[in-house]
A protein has these predicted regions:
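Acidic, glycine/proline-rich Ca2+-coordinating loop motifs
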Residues: 1-252
Length: 252
């Protein structure tokens, strides 16, 4: 979920990213390649619409996602960030979706939005495929005055860094930034972009961990170490080994 003044009335509104329709009283039974009980693939469950609660200024909220054009059909959302990505002074909404196209809702004024992720180059990876997007962070990592995006993904599919091209769109800068191979074997969830060492450049933190015990099938450990990256002005360098013992441990 994320807060932002989406209609420009001075009151914070709430956007809630929803995932799938799952009833624990009537669960879907899924298995891995060996027939053992396992986690279901997102395609096996129906999506739940996202919600946007507009602050009425009197302590109450009204759900207006459809009225504001802030709902992408068929999305299975796990992350959201509200920020001004096109530099017009109005907050936009980026939504990370699992195995479907990510969404970027551009604020067109008066509380109305236009979904523009495909047109602006941040709906899919640079290779053109939709990823298992989960965590999302925004920050100006290259200090050009425009907010960039970092999205975490499933194991065997690297996280993605989208560089903002001055408000006209985004480009996949993952490989150029040396972030492809370090993130490829891990499964990322939460992430933040912030200047953690006060050197003036944004850093990246990623919390990793598998969704299932795949060690018995693929050999992948479902406990995974977190990652910390620093930016040197050109590329990203993993620096967890020097940041303390926390980054040498594995978590779920």
């Amino acid at each position: 979920a994320a807060w932002g003044d989406l209609d420009g009335d001075g009151y914070l509104d709430l956007y809630v990213a929803n995932y799938v329709d799952y009833n624990p009283r009537d669960p879907i039974l899924c298995t891995d390649s060996r027939g053992n009980p396992g986690t279901c693939h997102p395609k096996d469950v129906d999506p739940v619409p996202n919600r946007c609660f507009i602050n009425q200024g009197d302590g109450t909220f009204r759900e207006e996602a459809d009225a504001r054009r802030l709902n992408g059909p068929g999305s299975k959302s796990l992350g959201v960030v509200i920020a001004d990505f096109d530099g017009d002074g109005q907050p936009d909404v980026y939504v990370a979706n699992d195995t479907t196209a990510n969404h970027l809702f551009i604020n067109r004024g008066k509380g109305k939005f236009q979904e523009s992720a495909v047109a602006l180059g941040c709906a899919a990876s640079g290779l053109g495929h939709y990823q298992a997007s989960m965590g999302v962070a925004a920050g100006d990592y290259d200090r050009d005055g425009w907010l960039d995006l970092y999205i975490t993904h499933f194991t065997s599919d690297s996280n993605t860094l989208y560089r903002n091209l001055g408000g006209s769109g985004f480009t996949d800068a993952t490989r150029d930034g040396k972030l492809h191979f370090p993130t490829l074997p891990l499964l990322g969830f939460g992430t933040i972009m912030a200047d953690l060492n006060a050197d003036g450049w944004q850093d990246l933190f990623v919390a990793n961990g598998h969704i299932d015990n795949w060690e018995q099938v693929t050999g992948d450990d479902w406990y995974m170490r977190p990652q910390l990256f620093r930016f040197n002005g050109r590329t990203w360098e993993e620096c967890g080994e020097t940041a303390g013992p926390y980054f040498s441990r594995k978590f779920l």
